[in-house]
Design a protein with these regions (language model features):
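Bilobed "Venus flytrap"/periplasmic-binding protein-like clamshell domains
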Residues: 26-46, 61-65, 99, 163-165, ...
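Extracytoplasmic small-molecule ligand-binding "clamshell" domains
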Residues: 35-42, 47-51, 60, 105, ...
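Acidic, polar ligand-binding/catalytic clefts
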Residues: 68-87, 164-166, 188, 199-273
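Residues embedded in well-ordered beta-strands
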Residues: 91-93, 158, 253-255
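Sec-dependent signal peptide cleavage junction
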Residues: 15-30
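Extended ligand-binding regions for polar small-molecule ligands
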Residues: 84-138, 184, 191-193, 258-270, ...
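Positively charged n-region of N-terminal signal peptides that target proteins for export
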Residues: 1-9
Length: 298
């Protein structure tokens, strides 16, 4: 009997060892690349690429175009123009159920479509990405929850953002730095319009730097009223938050060092995936760029 029990125990231990070894040997089947690094902002992803932490950064085209074309910091890097990821649209988000607040944001964007919206976009080189028109329909026009009234009564609105030029960035250094950007200027214009139309006294928006991966939680617990920072609209985000109408077009792009062109530059996405098999990829955690690398959920 003891001998039989010993044999059974040996078999069980052997099976457990095989399972453990298999688990230790498991790898994530990324869409491309062998390793994925995540950081707290898209700017950090670019900086990580520059430091040599990764071979490829995946970020928003809106941001990539700005840094590649308007600064010297990344003059030795390039966008892989022929590698096409999914095209996207940006939206503004509030806590789930706060449709009345988002409705007022929509209303203002539509009203400003031919004025401030275009003027601000022109300032930051984003006129070709604009999506709102004067005849755009506000899908939340009938919303009547208390979220807008709360902002009116509090006389303040707190907006969460990350540094993400030309959407939101510091112009200048140290104490002289000024927060500017397309979304920053647009948010101010929207609140100014709403104050004028509804005779409200909401102060100029308060902008708070957030951990992008915590944006939903920060909306839910009331730390911020809005996420207004080039947020890609997805079905999951529309399910978990109240999201505005699309206001800016975007797509995800791959950034590499120009010196690595021979290694990663391809004529299409499929060719890029093959070339990037052994690459280390860096993205902002919780971003659309991360979803371009992670395997699709089954």
């Amino acid at each position: 009997m003891k001998r039989a029990l010993s044999l059974i125990l040996a078999v069980v231990l052997a099976i457990a060892s095989i399972v453990t070894l298999a688990a230790c040997g498991e790898t994530t089947n990324y869409k491309f690349g062998k390793e994925l690094l995540t950081v707290t902002s898209q700017l950090e992803a670019l900086q990580g690429l520059k430091k040599g932490d990764a071979d490829i950064a995946v970020i928003d085209s809106v941001m990539a175009g700005y840094y590649m074309n308007n600064t010297d910091e990344f003059k030795d890097y390039k966008i892989l123009e022929k590698v096409v990821f999914a095209e996207e649209q940006y939206g503004i988000a509030a806590k789930k159920g706060n449709d009345a607040l988002i409705s007022k944001i929509n209303e203002a964007l539509i009203a400003l479509a031919d004025t401030d919206y275009k003027t601000i976009a022109d300032t930051y080189g984003l006129t070709s990405e604009l999506l709102v028109k004067a005849d755009t329909v506000n899908p939340l026009a009938s919303a009547n929850d208390e979220s807008w009234n709360k902002v009116v009564n509090d006389k303040k609105i707190i907006i969460g953002y990350t540094l993400f030029a030309p959407i939101a960035y510091n112009d200048g250094d140290g104490a002289d730095a000024k927060l500017v950007g397309f979304d920053i200027d647009l948010a101010k214009a929207v609140i100014k319009y709403l104050n004028t139309k509804y005779s409200t006294e909401i102060a100029e928006p308060e902008f708070v730097v957030i951990d992008w991966n915590q944006k939903e939680a920060l909306l839910e617990n009331g730390t911020i009223d809005l996420v207004w920072n080039g947020m890609t609209i997805t079905p999951e985000r529309k399910e978990g938050m109240s999201v505005s109408l699309p206001y800016l077009a975007n797509k995800q792009v791959a950034i590499i060092a120009k010196a690595d062109s021979d290694k990663f530059d391809a004529d299409n996405y499929e060719g890029f995936v093959k070339l990037a098999t052994d690459a280390v990829v860096i993205v902002e955690k919780g971003s659309a760029g991360e979803s371009m690398v992670l395997p699709d959920e089954e």
